[in-house]
């Protein structure tokens, strides 16, 4: 090895949270040993952000913009979040879905260094050592987002590249909710991959073996949770894009003892429930009297069903009544309690075919289920494009003046229905929310603004509220409060009004959600911090991209 000395990089330039680039004044440059290390110009943060925005606009592809922002995030954190804050509606699709999916697929090819921690199932004894390399104490971490990348967005298993979904999620926690990025961690739980394309790729950077499952997987996840909670007892443990079976199992196993959160289930449920609450302002029918068909009874669909069930009980229904008014449909059709392959979370909602007069072996599809149940709400979580046909929509309007029809699947190519079609088939009577962003629709001389059931309306505010409360758990009441707070910020008083608030006002939305979550945490006795002026405590906690 050569004894030649190499130039050092000053900490003020190498640490993303400290770096100001050409934002350092000349006095600061002299004090920090940066003389001659930067061009002579000194720019304000606004000027730097304007330069980056100009660079982004000059790029031809969303992936190119994602890569530019990723590198900025890696070296200059304050500027990254300033650009994101100034242009959040435009850049959310770049730093998160859908563009992050493409970035994840190209992770090993484009790897230039990465924020986050990589924990391997092949080295479970190194989990604590890996956390210790960060040099952080028990009071230094508020939020950890981890993924095993088995079910990334709509693209499936992408192994170690899934770290970018955790990084992207944290970026939205900060941009949308003011969660301090210096107090957040992204973690990859690398348990292998079943993606043959990755295993055959000579450049793939993750474990080169099939996904470990069963007892070994469970013990690895348990060890991660125990270690993270012991080292950082105040941290929210957010689980992102786990496979359906593991996502549900982890939440059910640890949700009553640890501050765990699954956005795919709980965040989605809160936002959809918020859209339902807004719809009730139009229909005037109490939640306890609604009947819901869930088309796509997987983890997301039944997670939504669980939250609606809990809200119906809070509205005065018995648990038995609430469950009976939710109708799950999956690949076999309407789910019946005599089916052999029901998942645990589907069982409570499965119907008795004999009570409905359905012969053994007969399949009840969506249209027939609607005729039997006379639902007021139809939720699409199936990823089956076009499943909500004209016949389905007309059946919904036959039993309800203003049916809520929510094609929630992502991306647009997998939506159960196009809003323009639903409005035409329902003669403008349907109340709509979608999972993908949709342009306003003109129908019968009215402009219909279609609310997007985007989880970003919920999870930043939920996280912020939990942090301000120092909550040791995330309870049903807290999620219910978040949904009501989101709905409170939408006012569908006129035909065509959106059922959900605009993400343009995301920081204000998150502040209101955080306050509601905090108050629910106090009410449930899980808060460790109390504040006389809750709103001010929330504002004081929110991190802003600025030079100190």
Curated annotation (Swiss-Prot):
List of residues binding NAD(+): 297-300, 410, 455
SUPFAM superfamilies linked to this entry: Aminoacid dehydrogenase-like, N-terminal domain, NAD(P)-binding Rossmann-fold domains
Keywords per UniProt: Metal-binding, NAD, Oxidoreductase
A GO MF term: metal ion binding
Annotated catalytic residues: 96, 169
Documented EC number(s): 1.1.1.38
UniProt-listed CDD domains: NAD_bind_1_malic_enz
Chain residues that bind a divalent metal cation: 240-241, 264
Enzyme class: oxidoreductase
Chemical reaction(s) catalysed: (S)-malate + NAD(+) = pyruvate + CO2 + NADH; oxaloacetate + H(+) = pyruvate + CO2
Cofactor dependency: Mg(2+); Mn(2+)
SMART domains: malic, Malic_M
Pfam families (UniProt xref): malic, Malic_M
Any one of the GO CC terms: cytosol
Family: Belongs to the malic enzymes family.
Protein name listed in UniProt: Putative malate oxidoreductase [NAD]
Gene that this polypeptide is encoded by: mez
């Amino acid at each position: 090895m050569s004894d030649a000395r190499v130039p050092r990089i000053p900490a003020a330039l190498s640490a993303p949270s400290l770096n100001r680039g050409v934002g350092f004044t000349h006095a600061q440059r002299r004090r920090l040993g940066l003389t001659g290390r930067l061009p002579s110009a000194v720019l304000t943060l606004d000027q730097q952000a304007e330069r980056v925005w100009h660079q982004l606009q000059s790029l031809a592809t969303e992936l190119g913009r994602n890569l530019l922002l990723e590198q900025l995030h890696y070296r200059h954190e304050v500027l990254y979040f300033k650009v994101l804050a100034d242009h959040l509606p435009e850049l959310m699709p770049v730093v998160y879905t859908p563009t992050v999916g493409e970035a994840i697929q190209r992770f090993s090819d484009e790897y230039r260094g990465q924020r986050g921690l990589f924990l391997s199932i092949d080295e479970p004894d190194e989990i604590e050592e890996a956390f210790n390399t960060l040099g952080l104490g028990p009071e230094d971490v508020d939020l950890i987002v981890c993924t095993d990348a088995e079910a990334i967005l709509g693209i499936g298993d992408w192994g170690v590249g899934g770290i970018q979904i955790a990084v992207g999620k944290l970026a939205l926690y900060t941009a949308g909710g003011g969660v301090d990025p210096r107090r957040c961690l992204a973690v990859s739980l690398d348990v292998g991959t079943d993606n043959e394309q990755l295993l055959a790729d000579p450049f793939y950077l993750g474990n080169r073996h099939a996904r470990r499952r069963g007892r070994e997987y469970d013990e690895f996840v348990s060890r991660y949770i125990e270690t993270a909670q012991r080292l950082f007892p105040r941290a929210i443990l957010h689980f992102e894009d786990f496979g359906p079976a593991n996502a549900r199992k982890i939440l059910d196993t640890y949700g009553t003892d640890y501050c765990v959160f699954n956005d795919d289930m709980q965040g989605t449920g809160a936002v959809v429930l918020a859209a339902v609450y807004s719809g009730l302002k139009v229909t005037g029918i109490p939640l306890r009297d609604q009947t819901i068909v869930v088309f796509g009874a997987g983890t997301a669909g039944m997670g939504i069903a669980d939250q609606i069930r809990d809200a119906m009980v809070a509205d005065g229904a018995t648990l038995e009544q609430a469950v009976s008014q939710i109708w799950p449909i999956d690949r076999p059709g309407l789910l019946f309690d005599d089916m052999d392959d029901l998942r645990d979370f589907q069982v409570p909602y499965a119907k008795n075919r004999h009570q409905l007069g359905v012969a053994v072996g007969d399949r009840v599809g969506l249209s027939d289920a609607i005729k039997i149940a006379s639902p007021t709400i139809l939720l699409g979580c199936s990823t089956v494009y076009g499943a909500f046909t004209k016949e389905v929509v007309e059946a919904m309007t036959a039993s309800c003046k203003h049916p809520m029809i929510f094609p929630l699947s992502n991306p647009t190519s997998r939506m159960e229905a196009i809003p323009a079609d639903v409005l035409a088939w329902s003669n403008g009577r349907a109340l709509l929310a979608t999972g993908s962003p949709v342009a306003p629709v003109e129908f019968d001389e009215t402009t219909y603004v279609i609310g997007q059931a985007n989880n970003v309306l919920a999870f930043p505010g939920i996280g912020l509220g939990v942090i301000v409360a120092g909550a040791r758990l995330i309870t049903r009441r807290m999620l219910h409060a978040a949904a009501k707070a989101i709905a409170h910020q939408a006012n569908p008083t006129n035909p065509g009004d959106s059922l959900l608030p605009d993400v343009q006002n995301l920081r204000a939305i998150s502040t209101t959600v955080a306050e509601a979550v905090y108050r629910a945490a106090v009410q449930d006795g899980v808060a460790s911090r109390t504040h006389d002026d809750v709103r001010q405590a929330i504002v004081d906690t929110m991190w802003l991209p600025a030079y100190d």
